[in-house]
Amino acid sequence: MIENRRGLDIFCHVMLIIGVLLILFPLYVAFVAASLDDTQVFQVPMTLIPGPHLWQNISHIWHAGVGNNSAPFGLMLFNSFVMAFAITVGKITVSMLSAYAIVYFRFPLRNLFFWLIFLTLMLPVEVRIFPTIQVIANLNMLDSYTGLTLPLMASATATFLFRQFFMTLPDELLEAARIDGAGAMRFFWDIVLPLSKTNLAALFVITFIYGWNQYLWPILITSDASMGTAVAGIRSMISSSGAPTQWNQVMAAMILTLIPPVAVVLLMQRWFVRGLVDSEK
């Protein structure tokens, strides 16, 4: 029995190592390409030894962009951060307050309102996106941070998750708060919000990555290069006119784009994992 268990452990670790290598190898190739110059990156086969031009490529795209794209990539990263952070804060705020109202306030048709929110999950993005663009255009929000972020702040999934968590809180907490004279918002700030920290952390990480990785929405809502985001900007760096693509600079842009979401995951890893575990209980 012990030998079988040891064999299973070895097999699992081997598969884990293989999986890690399969994930990291493309990233390593991108890192190597980002460190080469214009001629080295087109050599066949391309070298797998990092070159000395990484900071040169990063500095160039940070200030000048790549190819026909005149927007500095540093500005694109800033736009992506503003978009991701605003979507994250807005989505958490709207979803948490909506779920709190549905669970703790008694008003007519509150369950109907919840299920109407939940039913939006059944609508494909392609069905909702063009009417949303029309609304944003009518409100003169094209090429603006408001247009980039406001339509993505509502989340049926986050509302559902917070509702399920709030329903697990014992009713005695609400009764004790009422005895102490606490109002609805006092109960929310002093009791519900602190108990939701791990769930907030997990949702913060997931939502930030969701906002950071937005590709289709920024392309449709912006035409000004200065409002472009990093993920959409990388695609615009790839030449479609027959001219050679500067892959070393494109890969440098990709490396920079990876840093913020990876940093968020690493900084909030403990609370993220705890939030996922707590949400399953």
Swiss-Prot record:
<feature type="transmembrane region" description="Helical">
    <location>
        <begin position="188"/>
        <end position="210"/>
    </location>
</feature>
<keyword id="KW-0472">Membrane</keyword>
<dbReference type="GO" id="GO:0055085">
    <property type="term" value="P:transmembrane transport"/>
</dbReference>
<dbReference type="Pfam" id="PF00528">
    <property type="entry name" value="BPD_transp_1"/>
</dbReference>
<dbReference type="InterPro" id="IPR035906">
    <property type="entry name" value="MetI-like_sf"/>
</dbReference>
<comment type="similarity">
    <text>Belongs to the binding-protein-dependent transport system permease family. UgpAE subfamily.</text>
</comment>
<keyword id="KW-1003">Cell membrane</keyword>
<feature type="domain" description="ABC transmembrane type-1">
    <location>
        <begin position="77"/>
        <end position="268"/>
    </location>
</feature>
<dbReference type="InterPro" id="IPR000515">
    <property type="entry name" value="MetI-like"/>
</dbReference>
<comment type="subunit">
    <text>The complex is composed of two ATP-binding proteins (UgpC), two transmembrane proteins (UgpA and UgpE) and a solute-binding protein (UgpB).</text>
</comment>
<keyword id="KW-1133">Transmembrane helix</keyword>
<feature type="transmembrane region" description="Helical">
    <location>
        <begin position="14"/>
        <end position="34"/>
    </location>
</feature>
<comment type="function">
    <text>Part of the ABC transporter complex UgpBAEC involved in sn-glycerol-3-phosphate (G3P) import. Probably responsible for the translocation of the substrate across the membrane.</text>
</comment>
<feature type="transmembrane region" description="Helical">
    <location>
        <begin position="142"/>
        <end position="162"/>
    </location>
</feature>
<keyword id="KW-0813">Transport</keyword>
<feature type="transmembrane region" description="Helical">
    <location>
        <begin position="82"/>
        <end position="104"/>
    </location>
</feature>
<feature type="transmembrane region" description="Helical">
    <location>
        <begin position="247"/>
        <end position="267"/>
    </location>
</feature>
<dbReference type="GO" id="GO:0005886">
    <property type="term" value="C:plasma membrane"/>
</dbReference>
<keyword id="KW-0997">Cell inner membrane</keyword>
<keyword id="KW-0812">Transmembrane</keyword>
<protein>
    <recommendedName>
        <fullName>sn-glycerol-3-phosphate transport system permease protein UgpE</fullName>
    </recommendedName>
</protein>
<feature type="transmembrane region" description="Helical">
    <location>
        <begin position="113"/>
        <end position="133"/>
    </location>
</feature>
